[in-house]
């Protein structure tokens, strides 16, 4: 009887220790973000107005004008981003003490330096978006390096901020892009859709951070492209948030949202985004972060996944 009692006590202690260790592991799993946050939200604010080429996509693209003929209504649609959109979004971020990442086209900053300076003055990240609104996928190594470098230096001269993050036009990288970015001292890029968390890839044997972008929570895709209303876009954000927040109890999750100056900066879209911010901030463990701050945090974190799916291009 005594022996049996000892065995029962021993088994109970073993079970208790197992539960305790399991609980500790669960706590560790929740410690992926500052203050054990469940979910990080990262907002992109693309500043492209003034950098677009002739015939760039607009609400008037369905009835294009002859080549060489200026499309004045389309040009005015783009100017809205510099005149109204960026400033309206900056007011929103300031109201809720949110810092975002702004991918800035070099020629946009050169044409509207006061807008680029206002973004930097608000404490927002200035990230690279090319010298002009142009393709990179078809450039050779030397031309691509010059294109990226010229864009970074143009914006840096205006804002005083040197980009460490990058976004290609329509995400379309060349096989050399990451090697170009690494040579120029970049920390991360966003032209990837493969995960809902940051990850590492090796470029010439060194860690390079991937901060996945979004098409689902992207105004140019859903509002301009699919003709969603601001209410539909808000509903999408809430559903995405709810799911990622629930998953964030057990693993690292990041929610990406993308706004473009002339689309996300309209009154109804800013109002919808404000409703989302209020909705998200009601939950505990939700933080908004700049992409460069996230990238610095995860770059050498052993919990960050390593994915070398594009290894053949990066070495």
Regions found by a protein language model. Name each.
Residues 1-9:
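Bacterial N-terminal signal peptides that target proteins for export
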Residues 17-20:
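C-terminal motif of bacterial Sec signal peptides marking the signal peptidase cleavage site
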Residues 26-165, 170-209, 234-253, 257, ...:
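Catalytic alpha-helical scaffold of carbohydrate-active enzymes acting on polysaccharides/glycoconjugates
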Residues 203-221:
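A structural motif
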Residues 216, 222-233:
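C-terminal amphipathic alpha-helical segment
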Residues 260:
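Acidic/histidine-rich, metal-coordinating catalytic segments
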């Amino acid at each position: 009887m005594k022996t049996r009692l000892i065995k029962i006590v021993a088994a109970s202690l073993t079970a208790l220790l197992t539960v305790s260790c399991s609980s500790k592991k669960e706590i560790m799993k929740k410690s992926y973000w500052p203050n054990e946050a469940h979910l990080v939200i990262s907002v992109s604010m693309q500043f492209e107005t003034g950098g677009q080429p002739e015939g760039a996509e607009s609400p008037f693209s369905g009835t294009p004008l002859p080549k060489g003929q200026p499309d004045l209504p389309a040009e005015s649609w783009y100017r809205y981003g510099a005149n109204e959109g960026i400033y309206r979004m900056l007011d929103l971020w300031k109201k809720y003490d949110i810092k975002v990442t702004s991918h800035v086209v070099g020629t946009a900053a050169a044409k509207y330096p006061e807008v680029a300076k206002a973004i930097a003055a608000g404490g927002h990240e200035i990230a690279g978006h090319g010298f002009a609104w142009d393709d990179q996928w078809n450039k050779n190594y030397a031309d691509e390096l010059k294109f990226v470098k010229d864009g970074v230096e143009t914006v840096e001269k205006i804002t005083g901020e040197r980009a460490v993050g990058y976004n290609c036009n329509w995400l379309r990288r060349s096989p050399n892009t990451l090697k170009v970015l690494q040579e120029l001292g970049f920390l991360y890029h966003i032209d990837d859709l493969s995960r809902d968390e940051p990850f590492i890839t090796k470029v010439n044997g060194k860690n390079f951070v991937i901060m996945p972008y979004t098409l689902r929570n992207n105004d140019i895709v859903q509002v301009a492209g699919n003709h969603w209303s601001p209410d539909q876009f808000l509903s999408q954000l809430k559903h995405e948030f709810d799911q990622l927040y629930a998953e964030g109890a057990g693993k690292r999750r990041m929610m990406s949202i993308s706004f473009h100056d002339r689309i996300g900066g309209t009154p109804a879209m800013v109002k919808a985004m404000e409703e989302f911010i209020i909705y998200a901030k009601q939950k505990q463990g939700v933080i908004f972060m700049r992409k460069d701050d996230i990238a610095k945090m995860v770059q050498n974190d052993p919990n960050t996944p390593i994915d070398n799916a594009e290894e053949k291009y990066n070495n």
